[in-house]
A protein has these predicted regions:
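Hydrophobic/aromatic residues within well-ordered alpha-helical segments
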Residues: 23, 76, 80, 94, ...
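Helix-turn-helix/winged-helix DNA-binding modules
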Residues: 39-40, 60, 155
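Basic, helix-initiating cap at the start of DNA-binding domains
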Residues: 1-41, 45-50, 67-70
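Hydrophobic alpha-helical connector segments
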Residues: 71, 82-111, 126
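Amphipathic alpha-helical packing segments from all-alpha helical-bundle domains
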Residues: 78, 111, 125-153, 158-180, ...
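Short amphipathic alpha-helical segment with a characteristic S/N-K-E followed by hydrophobic residues
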Residues: 64-69, 80
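Short linear capping/connector segments at secondary-structure termini
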Residues: 118-126
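Short hydrophobic/aromatic patch on the recognition helix
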Residues: 52-62
């Protein structure tokens, strides 16, 4: 028999927990969008307005701005990590899956680059976030590379860390130079990985 509270009421229902989780997801999505357009120093009220929630809801889930920035960054990492297996299952070839995943990875890097910068003053938090980034995304990149090699789509020998680090370096500076499009160079990089087809 379920335990009752001191006033004879029931414990918090699953629907309330589900509502809280939905609110959290809504806030994270809204914050990510606001951070892209207005930067990580955007007013919390702007994020609340975008999410359609009160500021108290945001502070209940994320007591400090650093908590919110970290959660947004982790949320985007998770989305990128979870996309890998789905792309591999649905793409025409493992190389196509790799290429599509790298497109998502570049989207993440280009639009969320300032989030990591905002946390560098908190060295412990930044180090933990960077470790989380590597722990979640390197295995996905490894899976995609291994599948593409096994299918004969790309040459063997490419290390996941080298590839993600190289792509990350190509994306640096995009925020400050609208004339620079890292995707063109990344497309050339991927062409270099592709194994030539025999006639």
């Amino acid at each position: 028999m379920a335990a009752e509270g001191p006033m004879g009421g029931s414990p918090p229902s699953r629907s309330k927990r589900a509502d809280a989780q939905r609110n959290r997801e809504t806030v994270l999505t809204a914050a990510a969008e606001v951070f892209v357009t207005s930067g990580v120093d955007a007013p919390i009220r702007q994020i609340a307005a975008r999410a359609g929630v009160g500021m108290a809801t945001i502070y209940r889930h994320f007591p400090t701005r650093a908590d919110l920035v970290t959660a947004v960054y982790e949320h985007q990492i998770e989305a990128c990590a979870e996309a890998g297996p789905s792309l591999l299952a649905g793409a025409d070839s493992p190389f196509d899956a790799l290429r599509q995943w790298i497109d998502l990875f570049v989207d993440f890097l280009v639009t969320k680059h300032g989030l990591a910068d905002a946390l560098q003053s908190d060295s412990d938090r930044f180090a933990a976030l960077h470790a989380y980034f590597l722990d979640r995304l390197l295995p996905v990149c490894t899976q995609l590379l291994d599948a593409a090699v096994a299918a004969g789509d790309i040459r063997p020998g490419t290390q996941p860390y080298e590839l993600t680090r190289g792509i990350g370096n190509l994306c640096v500076g995009r925020d400050n130079d609208p004339r620079y499009d890292p995707r063109r160079l990344i497309a050339l990089l991927l062409q270099g990985l592709e194994r030539p087809r025999t006639p």
